[in-house]
Amino acid sequence: MGPLMVLFCLLFLYPGLADSAPSCPQNVNISGGTFTLSHGWAPGSLLTYSCPQGLYPSPASRLCKSSGQWQTPGATRSLSKAVCKPVRCPAPVSFENGIYTPRLGSYPVGGNVSFECEDGFILRGSPVRHCCPNGMWDGETAVCDNGAGHCPNPGISLGAVRTGFRFGHGDKVRYRCSSNLVLTGSSERECQGNGVWSGTEPICRQPYSYDFPEDVAPALGTSFSHMLGATNPTQKTKESLGRKIQIQRSGHLNLYLLLDCSQSVSENDFLIFKESASLMVDRIFSFEINVSVAIITFASEPRVLMSVLNDNSRDMTEVISSLENANYKDHENGTGTNTYAALNSVYLMMNNQMRLLGMETMAWQEIRHAIILLTDGKSNMGGSPKTAVDHIREILNINQKRNDYLDIYAIGVGKLDVDWRELNELGSKKDGERHAFILQDTKALHQVFEHMLDVSKLTDTICGVGNMSANASDQERTPWHVTIKPKSQETCRGALISDQWVLTAAHCFRDGNDHSLWRVNVGDPKSRWGKEFLIEKAVISPGFDVFAKKNQGILEFYGDDIALLKLAQKVKMSTHARPICLPCTMEANLALRRPQGSTCRDHENELLNKQSVPAHFVALNGSKLNINLKMGVEWTSCAEVVSQEKTMFPNLTDVREVVTDQFLCSGTQEDESPCKGESGGAVFLERRFRFFQVGLVSWGLYNPCLGSADKNSRKRAPRSKVPPPRDFHINLFRMQPWLRQHLGDVLNFLPL
């Protein structure tokens, strides 16, 4: 038999060698929906179903196998017919110290659930929540709290079960979701010494749910703005150096962009991945920070297109060029999704840089790292990606003190075989932030990256940043603090709230309206960073009149004790001069990492949410001193002491004639009391490494500096003193109409 006859017989016995590879059946329509194919009807093609808003596909996708049959990822049995099912939002499993209505097993799109608290408890969060078409509730978790714990009541998200009901320092709470729901966020949280719960608020969600771009963009932007604020925001670059910036002690950011290029990603989707990453690079280089960018694409194996060890990683043009040259076909021989290998490439890059710089050097230890993973599927080869994350955390020595040195953002794209549990496991867990998301498609991803870092907004909103390192000066710790002087005598203090406005007390100016000889000293007066400014305009509250109630036997009254000073020049921002955050503004909202749509009341509930709130003011010598603001019933007992002051208020019958609800109260035996000359200074809190002014020093019953010429000498009042020390501070939450009237063009105020 000749060679041609042998070949003919082989083709007859194995007809598959002569025909093209089998294709999958085309009877895959979905009732009420549509579908797309990544590679036609050929083996390896991913079929993705879509449904109208408010419905979700079941199954979400199918894969064409080499046998010519469709397989549903994760399914244990074949589904004969794909259908669109109605989206439902999870129901509350329990709600403490209150009631909710209506009580349903789950809620339809458009449905509402309302919450009310029992007597003695205050509602935090949203009183009414709305079920959205993506299967998520709008608003925030409703909590009925009495402020009794060291940490506020962490609440129970809808669909979750919590164990642990003690909220003292070191206490832990644990969460799990009811059946068929997926937990994102932290399954365990601990009450920390600063009164804040560790980790991220847990959310129970349907497996088919996804995030809207308008929710993801501000969440990512808020987290990034916090990170950027800690990464050398004042370092300037020179174009002549081609943006080539050396690693410095003042801080450096390594940004790692990981782009999925596996079989389930279409060429068009990969293009949008690249465009989104380019947007991020463009935004990040718009900030005056030291940054290096790594680019890694991956399928079955990773390809490092740009390493942070390459000098070009610090050049925006070179990084974007590397992205543009990324080729979809480079991975066509590897069809799997090896997320472990991609993250391990980051680990190896870090390890090489650590060896180059030295593990114990500040140059290595001061680098902050951010990883953004863009994927449309579940890791299906190479081992657990969590193992690589554990190695990364270990090499960076990530612990409670160094938690801010690593951020991992895990972003799933498309309603495919995206695994919520895996994304949540990879994403960082930080208080008030989210790091794991699923978006409906790559167009939504592009929209997120367009809006998450709007430089025009963020450069004016980095407020409340103080340097808390051990070697920082007092002024660097509180860079908003200013001194107000008539001629040469120091009289009052104030707080920088923008680059040209100072907030202070009205009684500093009660002796006349001519302020031409007054000066405001901004920055450290003992160094080259200090500078004196003339006052262009003083705005005194018209309601302030210290003698307004003299006829009632009240010799001095400090209601409306608030003033604004507009400086003749703008202040150049530096580590010694930077505004503090004012609550009820968009700037403070970003710093608090709160969602869009937050209100002034939300800020008050978050900042003044306990019976005794730790706070601070700045002393004459520039040091930061501690007080406790009394709220609720403790405010009443704090203020009642005024009735014992017979010199200033000899005929007082009602304490509230002197201490109105405009005032915050402090001054117990454990507290410091402000001295004369410290009036007008900020009363401020620390939250999430940022500082927020909630009041300003107004008046008190005791002057600890009386009779002393030494700024560092303060005398505590004897325990037998009558009346005991009490101090009163203008509550900025009660002065909102006046602040909005005069600062509406300066700050971006939230709804009341």
UniProtKB/Swiss-Prot annotation:
Signal peptide per UniProt: 1-20
Motif (MIDAS-like motif): 260-264
Record-level Gene Ontology MF annotations: metal ion binding; serine-type endopeptidase activity
InterPro entries for this protein: Compl_C2_B, Peptidase_S1_PA, Peptidase_S1_PA_chymotrypsin, Peptidase_S1A, Sushi/SCR/CCP_sf, Sushi_SCR_CCP_dom, Trypsin_dom, TRYPSIN_HIS
Sushi domain mapped to chain residues: 22-86, 87-146, 149-206
SUPFAM superfamilies xref list: Complement control module/SCR domain, Trypsin-like serine proteases, vWA-like
Record has Secreted as a keyword: yes
GO biological process, any: response to bacterium
Location relative to the cell: Secreted; Cell surface
Active site per database record: 507, 561, 679
Cofactor(s) recorded in Swiss-Prot or TrEMBL: Mg(2+); Mn(2+)
SS bond partners: 24-64, 51-84, 89-131, 117-144, 151-191, 177-204, 463-581, 492-508, 584-600, 638-665, 675-705
Entry comment on modification after translation: Cleaved and activated by different proteases depending on the complement pathway to generate complement C2a and serine protease complement C2b chains. Cleaved and activated by C1S following activation by the classical complement system. Cleaved and activated by MASP2 following activation by the lectin complement system. Cleaved and activated by GZMK following activation by the GZMK complement system.
Gene3D superfamilies on file: Complement Module, domain 1, Trypsin-like serine proteases, von Willebrand factor, type A domain
Residue ranges of domain Peptidase S1 in the record: 464-744
Binding-site residues for Mg(2+), renumbered to this chain: 262, 264, 337
Domain VWFA: 254-452
Glycosylation, residue list: 29, 112, 290, 333, 467, 471, 621, 651
Domain notes: The MIDAS-like motif in the VWFA domain binds divalent metal cations.
Similarity field: Belongs to the peptidase S1 family.
Designated name of the protein: Complement C2
Species this protein is from: Pan troglodytes (Chimpanzee)
Organism phylogeny: Eukaryota, Metazoa, Chordata, Craniata, Vertebrata
